[in-house]
From Swiss-Prot:
SMART domains: RPOLA_N (SM00663). Mg(2+) binds at residues 460, 462, 464. This is DNA-directed RNA polymerase subunit beta'. Keywords: DNA-directed RNA polymerase, Magnesium, Metal-binding, Nucleotidyltransferase, Transcription, Transferase, Zinc. The gene is rpoC. It comes from Geotalea uraniireducens (strain Rf4) (Geobacter uraniireducens). One of its GO terms (molecular function) is magnesium ion binding. Its cofactor is Mg(2+); Zn(2+). Belongs to the RNA polymerase beta' chain family. Signal peptide: none annotated. DNA-dependent RNA polymerase catalyzes the transcription of DNA into RNA using the four ribonucleoside triphosphates as substrates. NCBIfam families: rpoC_TIGR (TIGR02386). GO terms for cellular component: DNA-directed RNA polymerase complex. Binds 1 Mg(2+) ion per subunit. Binds 2 Zn(2+) ions per subunit.
């Protein structure tokens, strides 16, 4: 009877378990779970299509093929449920059990599991301490292994070849036991005592002398400990019986024509069963050992192929020559179980169609074709039809809908009301790629999209398609409306600025109506009110752009009215403005930037609702006025500057001059190339500037007859100036000159295209330009994939960074200051601290008042206070220093950028960070496509000019005065500052080695005065004293080559790498006596030359202090675009060591040079106190410090890029984070992309989660072990409580791939990469996945523990209060990122 009740049971709830454990299965476990042994390789009978008994599809083992019907047909239907048929042995139950019942195959001989054998490092090999090669020999019957040495003194598990085995037999007789194959290995594994081995290994580790031995022992100890703690037995890695997958998961489908399509697994299983049966028979017949061995080996290979085909030897191929898909392949990769079916599923109640623009829609609406709506809302329609009494049964409702009767459309209108749908455009790169709208029924078959949300979807209407999804349950509808409605997503989660901003036509229209025109109709009139302007405009008494004065009410404060100078167009625009927004916001020419600012200001002052209304009105007014303006462009709008020929002529002269210098041998080819490119880059800029000046100014005749220059209404200029379409770069190509083009290799072709598109290109110029443009297209295709992969890795590493508590109570934070480059402020401190939380009280430096109390969010008003107080540094809380154990606290994160207030609990900030960094990556890859391959490259900076006036101050600059009286800088970390009257430092510049300083200390200078100049393309080596040049070890053909230039016929001396390690090319300066000159005590005038240096002096020539004796050419610059950028971002996040990274000093101290060791230079840094540190620097690398220099910790001793791991080790986590944040930001900044720092910090935090154990103390940790920081801290606390010695660890920087793979959750790691490896390791450790991250919960089919899925939102109690006029309490907004 209870069976009947079970029938109506709900399926198992995915929520009633809290964790998942994975471990190695024992043979007993496999048999216990199995429903019977599969003995025959047969599948189904080809005539009756019924499964063969004991075969791979046997109904007795796996259950009936038809619901409640046994195989022979004796028992049919529900009434016999649960009976086992006595004839065919089949149980009468539903056929879906064929999806879950396992069978098994008993193997005639044990077989090794290939994952534990071949998945590196080999676990079986590690445990037994045998190399993989030897292990394979034993398993594949080519060698013997000692299973029990007894008292012969042989080592346990020693591997013998056939000959050695015969010898040992002769020597010891039968006093030892050895065997081959998996059975022997199983014996060995079974006889191992893990506790004894673990103790032995610990002793070995303490006694180990070499690092390599210690590491090897530690690895082995790890495996032993894993087995000990997990309760897995080592012999289970050898299989005695293998499970057989349920038949429905490896189906056999009859095709028409009597053939069958089958899963590859059936072939693989069949192979195993055949070989196993044959082996059983041979063993019964007592066949010769050779035959049996061969059959055993074949069985091992068959099982290997079943588990992981192709892992060992050649993959077994099916009849069509393609390798069969094994069980591992079913899990792995993009089309494996994890990524194809568990993380991304296809859903019903969805549709897709082409999109068209819907300019008359409101922001929260989208147009849904009637056909689609009818299909999507079917169940709701049926329900309504029945409710209204139009039909009585579902069947008749179905018929009615199919006939599309008029009532159906009425019902559809009703159903659709207030029921939001979700629109999604692939690729969904950030959360704004799916937004919710209220559907509006439309005719036609295309979905209509509101123009303002195109930016977020990155959609255009050239044939893009979008998908519609329908949220069904009430909860999902509420979430969709509250969190995903387009009207609730006005701000971008990446940078907190509005993303719903008018673009293109709308911008142009608003720009046109807010421009002012000199001497227009009605110029200078004065109006009494806004309405009066409107009347005058409608009566055509005043021009839209006339400059007039109007008396306006001050709506913001209700003060007395103001008279403002403005234009009728701006007054019209004011009509749609909310009262809270001041008129000054729009009383200017409204470009796209200004519009974005307007939406932002409106959001802050007037709130969400008003902003949405404003956005819609801006859309309408923008379209309206761009139509009225009727702006169009003609070829005459592309005005070519008159000075163009002169500029090009001048540039050509300069290029000739440089060519001559090169011919005379004054400069190298590299310098010549760089200088030529610089000249052309500058000329192109110059022409562009003149052209833009021309376009933006018109000359008109004023009423008094004078000619006046006024801003022009040139259409092309208006489009670019307003930001609606086109850029200065594109206009430059239309009317200036195209400029330099790039080769596909990224080098710049030195002959520029001097023509523009209006003049037309010659054949050669056209050819050069197609060269670069094609590269752009090819790149785009390739880079999109790379960028997608970067996003995937970022999401994976950050998916479990969730806001878990309000305040972690940390006392630590970051100090933030304005970001400057070359003395120029790139990002003001205000932009960097907005929306962050203050760490301590922020005080006014003058009055000492508290500007911002500690733990308070710094909002826009506070930022203004801080900036006006002139604070240069502010301490804020940061994700990096957050002490939350799991996740991040709200105070350390600060403002939720997309909502404009402090972040809510449960927000998935990690995923948002990953999307914010990944999304522009994909966008930027598309960027090259539009410029068309013109080389974009900044001319290098060669000099410094003062930006402010003041007095000069030298900071840490050593200089000598050369023969021309210039100060030449002789050290690297010098800085030059300009101090104003009050003694405040106005600007500060780092001065490079070898620069000429044009000013002297304490001199008063004016703005724009030259301070210093240098050659950006070479790095000079200068002499500090005068004297006579002598070469040392500069031997032609050994350490130096005379390179003859083919063009000029001149030779120059270049230092090359020598085979002789003792040869050290150097230039020595001798004094009059012929001795090496002393610079100062202990420092000689000896200069070592790195590989690649060009020697610029002759032997025995006389040099003065500050003269260049050799030059090291810098790289020729390539175009800087995001291609350089994306791999750079990936390199930073993967924490790769750069190719030639610089050795950095770990301490502060003074540099001296020691004796060379092993052909490397020895640099010694001596601190004021404590031990000196020695560094070896490879020969041929240029050492950038000099004897007697004072270096700071973290400073590079040689040329090269920084290695993030060194920065972490020497300067600590904060400096590393600062370095990573700044480097990543620089790449994006070059492209003009804004990303908030906190996103990059979130990713860096995830990269720094782990520590590496240096000393174990009294803890149970192992040396060199890598583990999560808080596990380490817990273990230390435990030991300290008992009075033991704690372990010592160093922070560890993991790249994002490594960090994702080393997460606690094995499910998440397995679904990311290296599935087999992750699962193998996890099963040996008996890992428990406590389902804390997002991915593992998605895979298990549960709600994610973020946003509304947080436990604290699940168990809310709703209490209805007595409504005695009490207003309900506001509910905290629930956010699900």
């Amino acid at each position: 009877m209870e069976d009947i009740f079970n029938f109506f049971d709900k399926p198992k709830d995915p929520l009633h378990f809290s964790a998942i454990r994975i471990s190695v299965s024992s043979p007993e476990k496999i048999r216990e779970r199995s429903f019977g042994e599969v003995k025959k390789p047969e599948t189904i009978n080809y005539r009756t299509f019924k499964p063969e008994r004991d075969g791979l599809f046997c109904a007795k083992i796996f259950g009936p093929t038809k619901d409640y019907e046994c195989n022979c047909g004796k028992y049919k239907r529900m009434k016999h449920r649960g009976i086992v048929c006595e004839k065919c042995g089949v149980e009468v139950i539903p056929s879906k059990v064929r999806r879950e019942r396992l069978g098994h195959i008993d193997l005639a001989t044990p077989v090794a599991h290939i994952w534990f054998l071949k998945s590196l490092p080999s676990r079986i090999g590690n445990l037994m301490d045998i190399t993989l090669k030897d292990l394979e020999k034993v398993l594949y019957f080519e060698a013997y292994v000692v299973t029990d040495p007894k008292n012969t003194g042989m080592p346990f598990a020693q591997v013998f070849s056939e000959d050695q085995y015969q010898k040992a037999l002769e020597e010891y007789g039968g006093q030892f036991e050895a065997g081959m194959g998996a059975a022997a290995i199983r014996e060995c594994l079974k006889s191992m005592d893990l506790d004894v081995i673990a103790d032995q290994l610990r002793v070995e580790m303490l006694e180990a002398t070499s690092e390599a031995k210690r590491k090897k022992t530690a690895k082995r100890l790890k495996v032993v400990e894993a087995f000990k703690s997990s309760g897995n037995k080592p012999e289970w890695m050898i299989l005695e019986c293998i499970p057989v997958l349920p038949p429905e998961l490896r189906p056999l489908v009859p095709l028409d024509g009597g053939r069958f399509a089958t899963s590859d697994l059936n072939d693989l299983y069949r192979r195993v069963i055949n070989r196993n049966n044959r082996l059983k028979r041979l063993m019964e017949l007592q066949a010769p050992e050779v035959i049996i061995r061969n059959e055993k080996r074949m069985l091992q290979e068959a099982v290997d192929a079943l588990f992981d085909n192709g892992r060992r030897g050649r993959a077994i191929a099916g009849p069509n020559k393609r390798p069969l898909k094994s069980l591992s392949d079913m899990l792995k990769g993009k089309s494996g179980r994890f990524r194809q079916n568990l993380l991304g599923k296809r859903v019903d109640y969805s549709g897709r169609s082409v999109i068209v623009v819907g300019p008359e829609l409101r922001l929260h609406q989208c147009g849904l074709p009637k056909k689609m709506a009818l299909e999507l809302f079917k169940p709701f329609i049926y329900n309504k039809l029945e409710e209204k009494g139009y039909v009585t049964t579902i069947k008749s409702a179905k018929k009615m809908v199919e006939k599309e009767r008029p009532e159906v459309w009425d019902v559809l209108e009703e159903v659709i009301k207030e029921h939001p749908v979700m629109l999604n455009r692939a690729p969904t790169l950030h959360r704004l790629g799916i937004q919710a709208f209220e559907p509006v029924l439309i005719e036609g078959k295309a979905i209509q999209l509101h123009p303002l949300v195109c930016t977020a979807f990155n959609a255009d209407f050239d044939g893009d398609q979008m998908a519609v999804h329908l949220p069904l349950s009430v909860e999902s509808q509420v979430e969709t409306r509250v969190l995903m409605m387009s009207t609730n997503n006005i701000l971008s989660p990446a940078h907190g600025k509005p993303i719903i901003v008018p673009s293109q036509d709308m911008v142009l229209g608003i720009y046109y109506m807010t421009r002012d025109k000199y001497f227009a109709k009605g110029d200078g009139k004065i109006f009494a009110s806004q309405e009066e302007v409107r009347i005058a405009l409608d009566a055509d008494e005043v021009d839209l752009q006339a400059r007039v004065k109007v008396r306006l009410k001050n709506l913001v404060t209700d003060d007395k009215p103001l008279i403002v100078e403005t234009t009728p167009g701006r007054v019209v625009l004011r009509e749609i403005l909310p009262d809270a927004v001041p008129f000054a916001t729009i009383n200017k020419v409204m470009t796209k930037k200004e519009l974005s600012n307007l939406v932002d200001v409106c959001y802050r002052l007037a709130g969400n609702k008003e902003t949405v209304i404003l956005a819609d009105k801006l859309k309408s007014i923008g379209f309206r006025y761009s139509t009225i303006a009727g702006i169009s462009i003609s070829i005459n709008d592309m005005v070519i500057p008159e000075g163009k020929p002169a500029i090009i002529g001048r540039a050509s002269e300069e290029v000739k001059e440089i060519q001559n210098q090169y011919t005379e041998g004054l400069i190298t080819d590299g310098e010549r190339y760089n200088k030529v490119i610089d000249i052309w880059a500058k000329s192109t800029e110059e022409i562009a500037k003149e052209m833009l000046d021309n376009l933006s100014r018109d000359i008109v005749v004023a009423p008094d007859g004078k000619e006046v220059k006024v801003p022009s209404f040139n259409a092309i200029h208006m489009m670019a100036d307003s930001g609606s379409r086109g850029s200065a770069q594109q206009i430059r190509q239309l009317a200036g000159m195209r400029g330099l083009m790039a080769k596909p290799s990224g080098e710049i072709i030195e002959t520029p295209i001097t023509a523009n598109f209006r003049e037309g290109l010659t054949v050669l110029q056209y050819f050069i330009s197609t060269h670069g443009a094609r590269k752009g297209l090819a790149d785009t295709a390739l880079k999109t994939a790379n960028s997608g992969y970067l996003t995937r890795r970022l999401v994976d590493v950050a998916q479990d960074a969730i806001i878990t508590e309000t305040d972690c109570g940390t006392l630590d934070g970051l100090t933030v200051s304005s970001l400057t480059e070359g003395g120029e402020v790139i990002e003001h401190i205000g932009d960097r601290i907005l929306g962050r939380v203050a760490l301590d009280d922020i005080l006014d430096p003058v009055t000492g008042d508290v500007l911002v109390p500690a733990n308070e969010e710094i909002d826009e008003t506070l930022v203004q206070k801080i900036e006006s107080a002139g604070l240069e540094k502010v301490k804020i809380r940061s994700v990096l220093t957050c002490q939350s154990r799991r996740g991040i606290c709200a105070k350390c994160y600060g403002r939720d950028l997309a909502r404009g207030h402090l972040v809510n609990m449960g927000e998935a900030v990690g995923v948002i960070a990953a999307q914010s960094i990944g999304e522009p990556g994909t966008q930027l890859t598309m960027r090259t496509f539009h410029i068309g391959g013109t080389a974009s490259r900044r001319a290098e900076q060669t000099s410094l000019e003062a930006r402010n006036e003041g007095s000069i101050k030298f900071i840490n600059i050593n200089y000598v005065t050369n023969s021309e009286g210039h100060h030449i800088v002789m050290n690297r970390n010098g800085e030059l500052a300009i101090i104003d009257e009050t003694g405040r430092e106005r600007e500060k510049y780092a001065i490079v080695y070898g620069a000429k300083i044009k000013v002297s200390p304490t001199k008063l200078i004016k703005q724009g005065e030259a301070l210093a100049e240098w050659d950006p393309y070479t790095m000079p080596i200068l002499t500090e004293i005068a004297g006579k040049v002598k070469f040392g070890d500069i031997l032609e053909g050994v350490t130096m080559e005379e390179q003859v230039d083919e063009v000029t016929g001149l030779s120059r001396k270049v230092v090359v790498e020598s085979r002789d390690a003792d040869k050290r090319p150097r230039i020595t300066i001798k004094d009059e006596t012929g001795k090496t000159a002393k610079i100062h005590e202990g420092t000689m005038g000896r200069y070592y030359l790195p590989v690649g240096a060009n020697i610029t002096v002759q032997e025995d020539s006389i040099v003065n202090a500050g003269d260049v004796i050799a030059k090291i050419p810098r790289e020729t610059t390539k175009t800087k675009d995001i291609t350089g950028g994306l791999p750079r971002v990936a390199e930073l996040f993967e924490a790769r060591k750069p190719k030639d990274f610089a050795v950095i000093s770990e301490i502060d101290g003074v540099v001296t040079f020691g004796k060379d060791a092993k052909g490397k230079r020895k640099v010694i840094v001596t601190p004021d106190m404590g031990e000196p540190k020695e560094y070896l620097i490879p020969k041929g690398k240029h050492i950038s410090v000099h004897e007697g220099d004072h270096v700071r910790a973290g400073e590079a001793l040689m040329d090269g890029s920084s290695n993030p791991h060194d920065i972490l080790r020497v300067l600590g986590q904060k400096e590393l984070a600062k370095y990573l944040v700044d480097e990543v930001q620089e790449v994006y900044r070059l492209q003009g992309v804004k990303i908030n720092d906190k996103h990059i910090e979130t990713i860096v935090r995830q990269m720094l989660r782990r520590v590496r154990i240096k000393e174990v103390g009294d803890t149970t940790l192992l040396i060199d072990d890598q583990l999560e920081r808080y596990i380490f801290e817990d273990e230390n606390e435990r030991v300290l409580d008992k009075g033991g010695r704690p372990a010592i660890a160093e922070p560890l920087l993991l790249g994002i791939t490594k960090a994702s793979l080393s997460t606690e959750s094995f499910i998440s790691a397995a679904s990311f990469q290296e599935t087999t490896k992750v699962l193998t390791q996890a099963s040996i450790e008996g890992k428990v996945d406590s389902l804390r991250g997002l991915k593992e919960n998605v895979i298990m089919g549960r709600l994610i523990p973020a946003g509304t899925g947080l436990a604290r939102y699940r168990n809310l109690k709703l209490v209805v209060e007595d409504s005695g006029g009490v207003s309900p309490q506001p509910v905290e907004e629930v956010s699900a990122g």
